[in-house]
Amino acid sequence: MPLPKIATPTYELVLPSNKKTIKYRPFLVKEEKLLVLAIESEDTKQITTAVKNVIKSCVLTRGVKVESLPSFDIEFLFLNIRGKSVGEEVEVNITAPDDGVTQVPVKIALDEIKVQEDEEHNKQIKLDDNLMMEMGYPSLDQFISNNFDMDGEMNIEKSFELIASCIEKIYNQDEVWSTSDCTKKEVMEFLEQMNSLQFKEIEKFFGTMPKLSHTVEIVNPNTKVESTIVLEGLSSFFA
């Protein structure tokens, strides 16, 4: 006699980028095991494969292309899947800014963490009086690299590669150049032609991009100094 099937609960959330409602389920034990093993391996390729497979498996709504979602959608989705899978509260250790040493444990309800949007954010970047550029958001691969890459901090070369991968098109009144028709080298050379003011506009795009954000109040137990801390990005909440 076969064993009974265990019912898996389903949940809904609204994607921050397009306000569409999607259905998802928690990790199964076998999926969580694969994810933990991949992260413990410190192999970025294994982590990439595991995270992709877990997110794709847990999203139940048809027609959702996970690879095409903006990075902040993926962060929000992954955080919610994790919350429904292993507990809807996470404890993180925050370094008290007044002494830079003391670790203060803080419990955060995952449903309180939202994607914050900046009113000054704009995907259209004006390069000069004639030329414009339209940006896209980092891909699923880039999201994984930012949150799980064990190689250390992002260097200048990686930063330029990230920027180049997010340029969707360059255009003026008469012509449009799609970067999908260009080589990586051509896009990188285009970037290197920019002056510092033009490049600052790109930095502003990334600096104002929607992101997971949550503000917490902490008290250093040693100095009794109170501090307000803004946590940003998935890695800040990954315990």
Regions found by a protein language model. Give the residues of each.
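Long C-terminal interaction/binding lobes of large macromolecular proteins
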Residues: 1-239
